From Swiss-Prot:
Transmembrane segments: none annotated. Disulfide bonds: none annotated. The keyword Oxidoreductase does not apply. It comes from Escherichia coli O127:H6 (strain E2348/69 / EPEC). This is Chromosome partition protein MukF.
Length: 440
């Protein structure tokens, strides 16, 4: 998990002092990718200057650049990448002029982004989650066993810091790559619809379904392992509560819980956003069909029916059940006959008109908790209030009580990232999910 020990001014001064900069036009980036590809084929991971020049020649030919100055331009490109810390150059006195080059971590990171991280793999994600689950279980067992400071550093903190956290970051990177792929798919669909939307419908449907399936597969894999991961993190957290000198472990566990929550939450949110985009595309296609002036679809259907016996086809259709409105539409017309006439004093009195009065009463009653610094259990308080009102008013009263309660303070348990338990608040199945408010 990424942690910065320096402040922002220190990092800025450090970058300025070392003159860090990255400039990779498309030809230089292509050259770097070519170097990484050729480097991956070598067992020693080393390349000579002649091999780099050969790689540059391939890139130069692909960009249709002149070959007369290939040596000078290749030398400039190599020196520029060494200056930008994308390549490391090693020379020796015995072999002067015959340098050896190796990719730096920065160069590997950039090329990995463009080459090795482009495809989503459920198997890779499953293996990562399996490794994380094993590491967390061993760390939780070690935490419950207890021991000296060396034991906590070696068997709990180190696996969490250097294995679990890094895999979480890798999964987070996979999600961000999926975000980028979604945007690319959207651009592809937009281009297809702009060119020839009639011919592009099948292609759009394929792109939509493939992306939706990949997102769902990713989320299902995460959710299947999420509960076990959280359970082991909670075991470690419980074990550290009795020790005052393990703040570094507790802080790391909290960071991991937050990271896992963000990963799972964003996975579901990205699915919801994609579903909305899917509906938007289908709505556009339906609108285009409705506005089809040339009746292309009608002509195609007529032709398909006429040539059915020569070229048989199958028709698949969906027919959803109709939603029936069970309200009595004539109720409004005979409202007076059913309810009779209200007394003049009550004719205009509705629940929303006494809402402010009720809210003031509840606010005054709940203020006692803040004055006495007593924890406020929303489940018990709401249930007590609802018992005083008819069932028809339960929703409105519960909303008022909760609105007034959350203004008094917050629950420290909310900052743990763990969901609260559902508590029944009436005898009709209504429930509320909220931590005890203990900080005013």
């Amino acid at each position: 998990m990424s942690e910065f020990s320096q402040t922002v001014p220190e990092l800025v001064a450090w970058a300025r002092k070392n003159d860090f900069s990255i400039s990779l036009p498309v030809d230089r980036l292509s050259f770097l990718l070519a170097v990484a590809t050729l480097n991956g084929e070598r067992l020693d991971g080393e390349m000579s200057e002649g091999e780099l020049v050969d790689a540059f020649r391939h890139v130069s030919d692909a960009f249709e650049q002149t070959s007369e100055t290939i040596g000078v331009r290749a030398n400039n490109a190599i020196n520029d990448m060494v200056r930008q810390r994308l390549l490391n150059r090693f020379t020796s006195e015995q072999a002067e002029g015959n340098a050896i080059y190796r990719l730096t971590p920065l160069g590997i990171g950039i090329t990995d982004y463009y080459i090795r991280q482009r495809e989503f793999s459920t198997l890779r994600l499953s293996m990562q989650l399996s490794i994380v689950a094993g590491e967390l279980k061993r760390a939780a067992d070690a935490a419950e066993e207890g021991g000296d400071e060396f034991h906590w550093h070696r068997n709990v903190y180190a696996p969490l810091k250097y294995s679990v956290a890094e895999i979480f970051d890798s999964i987070d990177l996979t999600q961000r790559l999926m975000d980028e792929q979604q945007q690319q798919v959207k651009d592809d669909i937009a281009q297809l619809l702009n060119k020839d939307w009639r011919a592009a419908i099948s292609s759009c449907e394929l792109l939509l379904s493939e992306t939706s399936g990949t997102l769902r597969e990713l989320q299902d894999t995460l959710e299947a392992a999420g509960d076990k991961l959280q359970a082991n993190l909670l075991r470690i957290q419980d074990a550290t509560m009795i020790h005052d000198d393990l703040h570094f472990v507790d802080r790391l566990v909290f960071d991991l819980q937050s990271k896992l929550d963000r990963i799972i939450s964003w996975g579901q949110q990205s699915i919801d956003l994609w579903i909305g985009y899917d509906r938007h595309v289908h709505k556009f296609i339906r609108t285009a069909i409705d506005m089809d002036k040339n009746r292309v679809f009608a002509q195609r259907l007529r032709q398909s029916v006429q040539t059915y016996f020569d070229e048989p086809w199958a028709l698949t259709y969906a027919n959803a059940d109709r939603l029936l409105d069970m309200r009595d539409e004539e109720m409004v017309l005979r409202d007076e006959e059913v309810t009779g006439e209200l007394p003049e004093d009550l004719e205009y009195e509705e629940f929303n008109e006494i809402r402010e009065q009720l809210a003031a009463i509840i606010e005054e009653q709940l203020a006692v908790y803040k004055t006495r610094q007593v924890p406020l259990d929303l489940g018990l308080v709401v249930r007590e209030y609802l018992s005083q009102y008819p069932r028809a008013r339960h929703f409105d009263v519960a909303r008022i009580v909760i609105d007034q309660a959350v203004r008094l303070g917050v629950a420290q348990a909310d900052f743990t990232g763990l969901p609260a338990k559902w508590q029944p608040i009436n005898d009709y199945g209504a429930k509320v999910q909220a931590h005890v408010i203990d900080k005013y």
